[in-house]
Structure formats: C-alpha cells, structure tokens
Amino acid sequence: MKSDNVRIGLERAPHRSLFKAMGYTDEELNRPLIGVANPMNAVIPGHVHLNNIAEAVQKGIYLAGGTPAIFGGIGVCDGIAMNHAGMKYSLASREIIADSVEIMATAHAFDGLVLICNCDKIVPGMLMAAARIDIPTVIISGGPMLAGSHPNVKNGEKIDLITVFEGVGAVKSGKMTEEELSLMEDEACPTCGSCAGMFTANSMNCLTEVIGMGLPGNGTIPAVMASRIRLAKQAGMAVMDMVEKNITPSQIMTPEAFANALAVDMALGCSTNTALHLPAIAHEAGVEFNLKQINEISARIPHLCQLSPGGYHRIEDLNRAGGIQAVLSELIKHNLINTDCITVTGKSVGENASKARILDPEVIRSVETPYHKEGGLAVLFGNVAPEGCVVKQSAVVDKMLVHEGPARVFDSEDEASKAIMDGLIKKGDVVVVRYEGPKGGPGMREMLTPTSVIAGMGLDADVALITDGRFSGGTRGAAIGHVSPEAMSGGPIAAVREGDIIKINIPEKTIALDVPEEEIKARMAGWTPPEPKITKGYMARYARNVESASKGAVVL
C-alpha cells in the first residue's frame, strides 16, 4: 500500500513517532490511511457545516477498517466575492484547490481519499485532483440549501439568492422598495448549504454523481437532512471498499462517463460553468473534450427539469422527485445513457439507477413530455467567437432566441453594471463586456450583477449580453459568455465598436458581428493589448499561464 512508505518498517520509526504525537495508535497505523479533505470555513454558507460531514466521513472510514487523516482546504464564496475585485480570484482558486490536494495526498502517501466539497470552484477543483492523483477516491458534497419563502407575496412563493440579486434591479427600476428588499434578504437563504437552485455548485454536485465519483444522492440531498450525514458515513465506507478492490478515478472518469455527464447536464439545465469545468476535469483525466460535443448531445437530450433560475423548482424539489438517479433512469429507458460505466459504489450506473423512478412528473418530466426538445446549454460559433461561446438556452425567453441589436461596448464589468443601473441600456441593445476573460480579467469574473439587474428591471426579454467573462449559474436571459478567443488574446470581440450590429441565433448556434471581414481585420491590425490589470502575486502568474475558456481555462 502507498501508506507503507510512512507506516511500515524499521526506517519508518520516525514517521510513526510523528503520527503518535497526534494521538494515533499502533492499531490505527496498521490500517489503510485515508486522507479526508475538509474545506470548512465560516465564509461560505455551503461550507460552514462541513465539520459535521467530515466527522461522519471519519466514522464511516473507521467502521470499514481504515484510519482517517483530515486536512483542510480553501474555498471562495462566489456570492460574497461578486461584483468586486474578489471575483477575479474565484475561478483561479480551482487550480489552487486541485494542486493543494495533490500535494497533501502525495506528500503523506494516502491509500485513498474522501474529498468533501460543496461550492462552485471547490467541486471541480476536487474532481481535477482526484483525476490527477488517481488513487481510490470518493467525493461527498455538503448538500444544497433549502429555498426561502417570499416575505412580500401572499402564501410565500419560493425564493433564493438570485431573487435577492434581481431585487436590486427591481429597486433601481422602482418596482420594489428598499424595505421590501431588506425583508427578502433576511428570508432568501434560510439554511446552510449550496445555494438552492441549479446554479454552479449544485450543477457540479449533480454531475459528480452522474460521472460516478459521488454516491447516489450526492447531488440533491439537502444539507440539513439526516440522510446527508448518513451519506457521508457511507462515503467513508465506500472508499475502503474501493481501496480493497483498487477502483480508481481513471476507471470511473472515462469518455463514456463524461458523455453521461453532458447528457444529464442537458436534461437538468445546468450552469454554463459546467462548460468550463467538465473540459478541465477531462483534461486531468486524459479524456478528449470538445465544446462541439455539447451541441451534439444537446440535440438529442431533451430538457426535463425546469429548475431555478430557469424555473420555479429548487434542488429540494428535485431530491423529492427522485433525484439524479430518477433522471438517469428516465434517460436509460430511452438508451441515452451508457449504463456500463463503473462508479464509486463498485456498481455500474445502470445498477445504481435500476430501482429509481420519477416521483413527481412535473419536477422531472419524461423524455416524451419535456420542457424543451433540446438540452439546457448551447455553444454558438461565428466571427465574434471563432472558438465558441456558451449560453444556457433553457433560461432564455423565446423572443430572445433570435435577436439582433446595436452593441453597447464596455471594457469591464464595472462600466457595464454602472451603465445598466443608470438606465443607459435600452430595449434591443446587445451589451458587450470584454477584457474580462481568463487572461484579461484576469480570472474571468462572473457577470451576475449586470444580468440580474437587467432581469430585475424587466429587460431580460429585450436585452442580450455577451462577454469573454462568464456567468453565475444563477443567470437567466440571453447571457452569452466564454467568448473565445478572449479580447486580451486578440480575439475578434476586441474589434466590436459601439453601435455595431450583432446577430444572435441560438437555434442555429450562430453569433455574428455584422461587419465585413475586411473591416474586422483592419480594426484588429491596429489593435494592441492593454496593460495587464494585475502585475504581481498569484493572479499575475495565473494570467500568464491560463488557457482559453474554450479549453476549460486550465493552467499549464
């Protein structure tokens, strides 16, 4: 076993002495050593309770005959980091998380890992680490937050964090008072857990379950339910079974598993950020991933779940309706899933889902009666985005699926947000936000503030926004991100000028700057990149080494 390097033999007496300094007994040191990553902190609602999950995981490892060794990890709350310099660091933290888990697992010769995570960049960071290290590993999430209840509406319809973001726009446009918004902010996030809709964190937790790196229930069991604690114990027991059978991530994270993940991604209407994270995870797993796969799979996988921000239902409803296993079961009935893929249970995807069924056909619709005939995401190509750009088509109102309008050009999110809040954006406009890509931002900030204000002002049915930055999983409307190549790398989005007509056709998967190619080339011939916004520290190094969003924004 790997841990023999720190436990067994005469030469390892100093190593054992150090373990004994922490209270480990000889009996514990004669068992497999399992690393437990616990990124608990008191800054993220989705991570504030992870000590409870970690305690349960450790109990599960002990129950199955292993010895847990817990270590910490960082985590950024995207909501708190939103709309200021902190958001530059969110995506970049994904690589730090992956690197730090690799360091801890390798330095201490763990035989297996249980990686606890829950929020936006922590989940993909942990998955990237699992693929890279390739020792028996189980991912266990902390679970979703429950939805809040609207304090300003009779019978209290469900609300979540995005309701509050959109409330800012409603106040700006006079549709809501500040007092009403204050009441809403008190009620929108009533428990710990990852934010309640199908935003990035829950998207990735659900896809972790589909890929096979998380146990059934991982994606949807709410944070505050006792069954989440039981699942954490089972995760600890499962990793011991994997160690015994030598089941590793490379056996689980196969091309077929990623195809399954994309299929369920389309059925659920997941965050556009999955189009960043799945390629990055696949890169670590040595699996080829092309953005065109999204359109190919979306064309044959219908959209079955209308979850917030694209609909009324929340993750707690999806859990009640049968969860991810019920979605898989429905897709399996129509031969849309590879059922042979192995999972952390030691069983196949098909075996895990064999007893699942849809318990609420309005939350999880059948393939015959979907919300939309195509899946949740689409990748658009054209002269403004030769390498592609991404939109959550399931959250776009029908009239905006095909749109053309004048470009309103901004070289930062801050400029765009101010213009929107000042009422300078009109119906029909196409807001262009550039120099916010992985290199240009740097860090590819989420544009939740401008898109939420647009929605809160009631303009989401009339205004589009395109950017080389990205969007929160909570974004809705004609919000088109990940434009590649980005402006900082000389992508043609840098050539767009105020008033240029931009044509968007989501059904046809096209986006075009209505300017002759000769003119675009002439504009770019006179273009020079702006000075870097950050010249020292981690983000300066990140900007120099990060790849295009079309490649998952991985750091080489």
Curated annotation (Swiss-Prot):
Cofactor: [2Fe-2S] cluster; Mg(2+)
Alphabetically ordered keywords of this record: 2Fe-2S, Amino-acid biosynthesis, Branched-chain amino acid biosynthesis, Iron, Iron-sulfur, Lyase, Magnesium, Metal-binding
Cofactor note: Binds 1 [2Fe-2S] cluster per subunit. This cluster acts as a Lewis acid cofactor.
Gene Ontology biological process terms from the UniProt entry: isoleucine biosynthetic process; L-valine biosynthetic process
Gene3D superfamilies: IlvD/EDD C-terminal domain-like
The keyword Amino-acid biosynthesis belongs to this UniProt entry's keyword annotation: yes
Superkingdom field: Bacteria
Catalytic residues, chain numbering: S472
Molecular function GO labels: 2 iron, 2 sulfur cluster binding; dihydroxy-acid dehydratase activity; magnesium ion binding
Annotated protein name in UniProt: Dihydroxy-acid dehydratase
Provenance organism: Desulfatibacillum aliphaticivorans
Lineage of the organism: Bacteria, Pseudomonadati, Thermodesulfobacteriota, Desulfobacteria, Desulfobacterales
